[in-house]
UniProtKB/Swiss-Prot annotation:
Belongs to the LDH/MDH superfamily. MDH type 3 family. The lineage of its organism: Bacteria, Pseudomonadati, Pseudomonadota, Alphaproteobacteria, Caulobacterales. It comes from Caulobacter sp. (strain K31). NCBIfam families: MalateDH_bact, PRK06223.1. Substrate binds at R83, R89, N121, R152. Keywords: NAD, Oxidoreductase, Tricarboxylic acid cycle. InterPro entries: L-lactate/malate_DH, Lactate/malate_DH_C, Lactate/malate_DH_N, Lactate_DH/Glyco_Ohase_4_C, Malate_DH_type3, NAD(P)-bd_dom_sf. Catalyzes the reversible oxidation of malate to oxaloacetate. GO terms for biological process: lactate metabolic process; tricarboxylic acid cycle. The gene is mdh. It catalyses: (S)-malate + NAD(+) = oxaloacetate + NADH + H(+). It is an enzyme of class 1 (oxidoreductase). This is Malate dehydrogenase. Gene3D superfamilies: Lactate dehydrogenase/glycoside hydrolase, family 4, C-terminal, NAD(P)-binding Rossmann-like Domain. PANTHER family: L-2-HYDROXYCARBOXYLATE DEHYDROGENASE (NAD(P)(+)) (PTHR43128), L-LACTATE DEHYDROGENASE (PTHR43128:SF16).
Length: 320
């Protein structure tokens, strides 16, 4: 049986970490692409040499030509400029939109049957643009953000309650930004919804509100600490979870930036919602029941995403 071919577009901190995890998990043959000559080749060789230590037979190759990703089953896109202190994700839009155009054209020409996961920020606008530039079916192009945001939410809950992260199920909706919506009523610790934890005294409402606020600013917290870049370990793990569900047809329900066609009362845009990921790509959107407060927060987040889409259209008239 032929092994899957995984193309990692961008050999920066996330790209290199993706290659390392994919190799350890033996997800398939790995192509690490970057326009910077030597960078993908060096990282691929380093990880390949490490495989002799962690005992996995893997194929890794660093490349600088999109032709080398021909026939890729999965493409994970991290290419672009990362955030630095004082920058919002939205500040990256103009630069990274041009990158998405080049990447989309490369995928369209050489890997038109791939399942594409976009990580580049501002995420919701970039995955929308990438789908248009690539021309791939909308269910085969999704964005990684919700898995990461929900993981941060879960970790902060675990840290505060002292409960294993394995027994915490946390969810976020909306765009990947400060207006994201941590779904307090639908998130659980040991099966108990978070409002019930407050009633039982595990958490105070003030503590829960603090966790929600920290979740929304989770990426910025790391940017401020690193000073020279943004998060890469957790984003890479999140994308690998999505790719694994696709390659192994696991049908996992994961929050991702997905193209909506009427779900949540929205149509024609990408935004973070829970979705079943299987061999068909984004196979089914899961719709949470939302109250008036949640609807209002979600609507605010969606408006932020729409604003970024309009900004993209103003830069590139090919986007519709």
């Amino acid at each position: 049986m032929a092994r899957a071919k995984i193309a990692l577009i961008g050999a920066g901190m996330i790209g290199g970490t993706l290659a390392h995890i994919a190799a350890r998990e033996e997800l398939g043959d790995i192509l690490l692409f970057d326009i910077a000559e030597g960078t993908p080749q060096g990282k691929a060789l380093d990880i390949a040499e490490a495989s002799a230590v962690f005992g996995k037979d893997v194929s890794l190759k660093g490349v600088n030509d999109y032709a080398d990703i021909a026939g890729a089953d999965v493409c994970i896109v991290t290419a672009g400029v990362p955030r630095k202190p004082g920058m919002s994700r939205d500040d990256l839009l103009g630069i990274n939109l041009k990158v998405m155009k080049a990447v989309g054209e490369g995928i369209k020409a050489h890997a038109p049957n791939a399942f594409v996961i976009c990580i580049t920020n501002p995420l919701d606008a970039m995955v929308w643009a990438l789908q248009q530039f690539s021309g791939l079916p909308k269910e085969k192009v999704i964005g990684m953000a919700g898995v990461l945001d929900s993981a941060r939410f879960a970790f902060f809950l675990a840290e505060k309650t002292g409960v294993s992260v394995e027994d915490i199920h946390a969810w976020t909706l909306g765009g990947h930004g400060d207006d994201m919506v941590p779904m307090v009523r639908h998130s659980t610790v040991g099966g108990l919804p978070l409002p019930e934890l407050v009633k039982q005294g595990w958490l105070s409402q003030e503590e829960l509100d603090g966790i929600v606020k920290r979740t929304r600013g989770g990426g910025g917290e790391i940017v401020a600490l690193l000073k020279t870049g943004s998060a890469f370990y957790a984003p890479a793990e999140s994308a690998i979870a999505m790719a694994t569900s696709y390659l192994k047809d696991k049908k996992r329900v994961l929050p991702c930036a997905t193209f909506l066609t009427g779900q949540y009362g929205l149509d024609g845009l990408y935004v973070g919602v829970p979705v079943v990921i299987g061999a068909g790509g984004a196979e089914k959107v899961i719709e949470f029941e939302t109250n008036d407060e949640e609807k209002a927060m979600f609507a605010k987040s969606v408006e932020s995403v729409k604003g970024l889409m309009e900004a993209c259209k103003a830069i590139d008239s090919a986007l519709v």
